[in-house]
Amino acid sequence: MFSLQLLRTWHNFAKICRTAEEAVEGIKDGALIMSGGFGLGGVPMNLLNAIRESNVQNLTVVSNNPGLGDKEGKLDWGLGILLRKKQIKKMISSYVGENY
């Protein structure tokens, strides 16, 4: 029984999505998400933009840094785009030196 449930669980995550919007459609208000990248490299911007456009709120985000941003919003990058729209309620990071 355990193996079957584990297989079902894994199978549910083995979906190929054709768009970033499809990939994030299951993210609901209050979700916990993790994001990769550091500084300007390896950041999943297509997925983060899709999350931003979905208007989900109260996210808890785990990442090594909260992205980039400035007071005017001209340099927002990475998780900074979600911080700008106040979609992140709690941030768990190891480095926060570059964000506003």
Report the location of each language-model feature.
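Conserved alpha/beta enzyme-core scaffold
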Residues: 2-100
